[in-house]
From Swiss-Prot:
Residues 510-676 form the Helicase C-terminal domain. Residues 35-60 have a biased composition (Polar residues). The active site is at C1735. This is ATP-dependent RNA helicase DEAH12, chloroplastic. Its main location: plastid. A zinc finger (RING-type) spans 1564-1612, 1722-1750. Zn(2+) 3 binds at C1652, C1657, C1675, C1678. It comes from Arabidopsis thaliana. GO terms for cellular component: chloroplast.
Amino acid sequence: MRNSFPPSDGGRSATDRRQQSSHSSSTNRYNSRSAQSSPPLNHRPTWNQQHSQYPNSNFPPNYRRDRNPSSGYSPPVTRARPNFIVQLLHPAAANSDTKLCFSTKKQEIESLALLCEIPEESIHVPQFGCIAGSFSFRQWVDARSAVVALWDYRLQGKHEFVPELIPNVIVPSDMNELKDRLRDLFSSHILSLMENGEGVKKVRLEIEEKSRQVVSFSSKRGLKFEVFEKKKAIEAERDLVVNRLEEFNNAMKSILRYLIGQDGYEFDLDDEEEGDVAVFCLEGAYDWRRIHCLIRRECRRLEDGLPIYAYRRQILKKIHREQIMVLIGETGSGKSTQLVQFLADSGVAASESIVCTQPRKIAAMTLADRVREESSGCYEENTVSCTPTFSSTEEISSKVVYMTDNCLLQHYMKDRSLSGISCVIIDEAHERSLNTDLLLALLKKLLSRRIDLRLVIMSATADAKQLSQYFFSCGILLVNGRNFPVEIVYSPSDTEENSVVGGIASYVGDVVKMAVEIHKTEKEGTILAFLTSQAEVEWACERFITPSAIALPLHGKLSFEEQFRVFQNHPGRRKVIFATNIAETSLTIPGVKYVIDSGMVKESKYEPRTGMSILKVCRVSQSSARQRAGRAGRTEPGRCYRLYSKNDFDSMNLNQEPEIRRVHLGVALLRMLALGVNNIAEFNFVDAPVPEAIAMAVQNLVQLGAVVEKNGVHELTQEGHCLVKLGLEPKLGKLILGCFRHRMGKEGIVLAAVMANASSIFCRVGNFDDKMKADRLKVQFCNQNGDLFTLLSVYKEWASLPRERRNKWCWENSLNAKSMRRCEDTVKELEICIERELTLVSPSYWVWNPNEGTKHDKHLKMVILASLAENVAMYTGYNQLGYEVALTGQQVQLHPSCSLLAFGQKPSWVVFGELLSIVDQYLVCVTACDFEALYMLDPPPPFDVSQMDERRLRIKKVVGCSSTVLKRFCGKSNRSLLSIVSRARSLCSDERIGIQVDVDQNEIRLYAPPLDMEKVSALVNDALECEKKWMHNECLEKYLYHGRGQVPIALFGSGAQIKHLEVDQRFLTVDVLYYGDDVVDDRELLTFLEKKIDGSICSIYKFAANKQDCDEKEKWGRITFLTPESAMKATEIQKFYFKGSVLKLFPSLSTGGGIFKMPYFSSVTAKIRWPRRESSGRGCLKCPSGDIHRILGDISSLEIGTNYVHIQRDQQSNDSILISGLGDLSEAEVLDVLEFRTQRRDLNFFIFRKKYSVQCPSPTACEEELHKRIFARMSAKNPEPNCVQVQVFEPKEDNYFMRALIKFDGRLHFEAAKALQELNGEVLPGCLPWQKIKCEQLFQSSIICSASIYNTVKRQLNVLLARFERQKGGECCLEPTHNGAYRVKITAYATRPVAEMRRELEELLRGRPINHPGFTRRVLQHLMSRDGINLMRKIQQETETYILLDRHNLTVRICGTSEKIAKAEQELIQALMDYHESKQLEIHLRGPEIRPDLMKEVVKRFGPELQGIKEKVHGVDLKLNTRYHVIQVHGSKEMRQEVQKMVNELAREKSALGEKPDEIEVECPICLSEVDDGYSLEGCSHLFCKACLLEQFEASMRNFDAFPILCSHIDCGAPIVLADMRALLSQEKLDELFSASLSSFVTSSDGKFRFCSTPDCPSVYRVAGPQESGEPFICGACHSEICTRCHLEYHPLITCERYKKFKENPDLSLKDWAKGKNVKECPICKSTIEKTDGCNHMKCRCGKHICWTCLDVFTQEEPCYAHLRTIHGGIGLVE
């Protein structure tokens, strides 16, 4: 800007109003103004009044002296040229040609003229140009007054225009006069500010307030430590404010000295302190605009109160005296913007430049703009500049230059003396970036050569001592901040460290919980929570739901508008901000009062051992933790909640590890080699990298062709020099140079730009639906060559758009517009750099086309491979393992965002940008590469390509297995599958081997190296053969009818045949008990038992008992044998030793199946014992405290049985009584008498027994005897032999008693109690009389439930337990287990309460079963999917219930209250049926015979939202799931068919795989037509129509000769297995088929079995053999008694043959009977009468009296007797 006046080197003449000016100067020079509204200094109005102020008041204003005044004078039409012009420059236009609004300008100028009383005719306002307006004057005095007035009003803040005097008549004395006037004006203004300025007043009030607070603390005695610390903090704040005021006054005095020093005027100013440095270097002519800007900037600094302002002179002193200084100041102290201005103001840089480096380009540009704005008018134009990129042709010319540390490094390489730079400021040194550390090391060497160079290292949290010691123990200056005190609260989490649920670490949930707790309990104030990633931030925002608060995300991928939301106010709602470490130092959020520190941060770390850069979550450093805590004390005292312990904090690193130890050193080594540093290991780093990192970096540079080794010294190649000039990461530079060689320069530059910004281009934020939409939008850009090609296509399309459309296009396609612009800036910088440094022309055209596959794709892939040759990974061949990194052998997966996944394929070889370590490790920025290209690399890759390819896992498919076999092959929860995988890996010594089962495709995929494939295949085939054998042998154990007693059992198996019919009540099923801690392999265990017993297993049931349940934990399961002989043999063997564990087999409690299946009833447990050591006759009674005297009185004279006992007090114990003379009495016998005499139940009595134990029978013998006795006493209800189980424990040497555990069926509790009561006091065989059995009158049982069930039924369970407590006879106790579950222990003195209480508990804890006709196996299988699990969780949350899914049996139960169960059942049925229906309306876009790019083609053809299909199929609702490659159709089946047709047409088009083959129609072997509603048989996998199979079953039921039922396929004939019958037939039909099969079995048994002779009786009995006697069969169904030999009524004592004859001729039996007997017939009724003794008078049953001698008949007995006496001489009695 031009000066307002010429240099003040002219004198004043005697004729130029000396007296007036002298008087004006002397009287008004140092007087301050009394009020802002008073007229300007030395100014009087000159218009419309006497002009006494002017020398000749007779002349009017603007009067020229060459003309005489005349009252009639009228000015000519053409105005005369003015002598003086005062121009007004607008501040916005002072340094530019900015166009201003003319009307606004004119209004402002006219208002200002009116204020200064300037005539309207003097005003001129141009429409264009940088001059806002001007005033014309003829008289000097008017012009001078106008200038002074305008500056006065500007100083008062009434306008912003800059006055500038343009004199047409130059008189030196006039200029001096004006200078004096303005100097007086400015001096008065400065004095006014120092005395009464508004800023000064506020600061003084603040000092007074702080002083009062300090005094109030000082008046108190005995201050606590916290209060004392608070006092110290306030004193520090007060001192800071005082220093600010002193600094302001010092600056004002510095300006005053400059103002008065021009002409040597004396002024009463305090002398400068000794050694003080002038804060302003003001020389030469007065620049009033600059002086005013300096004053205003000082006022702003005073009001802003930046802490560094108080340290200005202290900083300047140090910089003037010392060459190096470390400046430590907290974020927000102002060091980044103010220090450069301090140095520029003070002139420390002289005529050279001050350079301030920043780690990031955006920071350098932002700070330069800010400093330029703050210092506007304080310096000349272009004093402050920013150099974001290096150019070898540009020189540093500005006074203050902001640039990146990378840019300064490039300058250093060009000019190793940094000529033209006098001061270097390294900002943000606490970040310890690679460039910063390298720059510090190079500057250290330079400082010894350039003594005039100054270095200032600025940091917020850096280790000042380390930096000071590194720089020759230089000085450290600490700038204390203005933070408020922050209370630290350590609140470590109870969850296991690093535990992960659903991909989210546990600490994220802890942060959300803490935020909820703070919101509920703490006062108002914003909550700021620190997490590590965008995913965690979004997860936390979704989980934090509170009406009175708003959760806001803050991370680097948000747009500016979204980030700005955290700075806005939300009335009535508390802000809860979940942020990444972007909120640590980069941003200052107002109002934050509470901080939640998770203690975790995500860092990129280079691992020299593997040569990989890994982004992983780790602990923060102490300095970062303090930074986070400091966020809570910006505006008021705050609190920081650290979710870790104080010990954890103490164990953290003090500072963040320097980047030089965390990143690849390629760029640094290139620059050092370019600088001639040959021995890098001995280079003087601040923190030297580990030697391995240096070696790996050198190896990488050699691989890239940038470095070669000659004579043991590494030298740069020609390509290496080019990479140095580019200043990029070597891999990016290699990428660009490689593309230029293939004439694809544009593509190479863009690739380098997008690769550097790859993680932020696609914008996947928001809720779940938003993210899914973003995924769909991304598909249209996905390229089958990988992520870099995808990013390249995105940039190409974006760059082709007009600029005004780009932002909207990014928004529509979920792209980050800011990242795209950043890529564009990078592209432009690279183009300029390449043209300037490499003299290459950057092409403006594209060669590569993303829509066409050409040679350019191959070239690009080759260039990318050459640039990332060390980052190669090979697909292992096994999806679960993913890719194997070539250098390290790690198995990692592609990141879910990888473009390759959109094509459903995994290329064999890929290159990747970096490894991302979150919960798992992922490859990111992945590009496919060709196998042949690996051999073309020069130099060759640092791994053996051929060897890696040989180790690749091959795949072998095992087909022909049914879904049932595959499920059983996997086992419950895949345990059997995992076991066989473990065995295969152990056998082959290869942990990569895998086995994958696809039930939908009915195949097993084996993954193994070629050499091991046969071993793995053999293992799998053996297991499959086992499962197939068991499936073919599988039987249903069915009772022929329901009832007790001797109920026949049939084994109903494959072919619908009866495999065995058991009518002799021999058991077939055994319970298997496993005693061992290791998890057992079920298949191995069953195979072991079959071999040991030499029998076939036909049914297996695995118990689902909780391992923590002490009653059930040893039970493995239940197995059924095909023959009772095998079952008996299994139970006869005492123990099986299996892999170091013990197996025991017992006859099973519960057998049967179908409608006659007997339910298993929970067991009740009782304990018994008998002594092993004989009694000594003495015992001890322990009394409750304080009751011994009373008890002694009660038992003073005691007789027990026939024994008189002696009572005495124990002298060695205060609460014991000794009792002797007991003989062989037991503890129970004595205690019963004692309790009766004392009427107490709290006594404790024990007998002193002899030292040695007597010989007892073995535990096995005791078990058998006890079982025999108890079972004999329980036989009233014909119980099964297995209703009682007895276990006698092996005693230890020091045990006084033998102990046994008895378990019995809870239904028989009454019989069991009676049996145990009778057993009490008995003596077992082989025991002595005193070894009496004692049954503990305490029965126990327990039941366990999971924590989830407990939380659901907690209230009902408590109510139930409370009711149990009120009942007599039993107790219940609830206790948690160590694994988080809950156990209910039931204790009672009788068995019935135990059984009843357990039954009610089981009903509550096991829930209500859900039976719905629509819940088929296929429908219920949805619940095992991820969507099904989420569905159950949602219903559980909404209905407050818990849903139990039995995955093995596919049954569903619901726990909760009756009302809630009903609601949950209704919702579950509705939701699951809807989901099943939707699954029927899914179209899959991925499969073995589907073109891999089908999903992209669908998106390309119909749009990401499938709008093209919706327009053609009206009313259909479609949604594309990109993760699963599925189109979900919501609409009718007809709509689905239409959509499917459109997709199929697209799929048939030409693709990389060619046309899709036509589907082969399958013919049903029964109806010989195309299969309709097909079903594959489990045994042979042949496909039939389901209806045909059902018809086959129906025909077999009608024709008994059709058994067994076989597969109808030609050359098959395999029996249809039980699994098929269960799947195809209802229970009713299955029972009907069983009945038909039973009839067929009996009919075809060759007479071995027969049905009961009673019509329609279902019972069957075994026919006695020819040599067997006819044993009776008592039918349990109809109670008939039948001879098993002749099948007639049971006929004891008569042979079957004779009984048959008697049946045929009843008289024959009478005659046979009468032989040899005194027998005659009644003459009347012909009845046979046998006479054995007595007289000859006989009476027949017909009532007639008969004479036995002559058979005469009489009606009465007297005539008969008379006849005997008369005719036969007597009645026939022998006298």
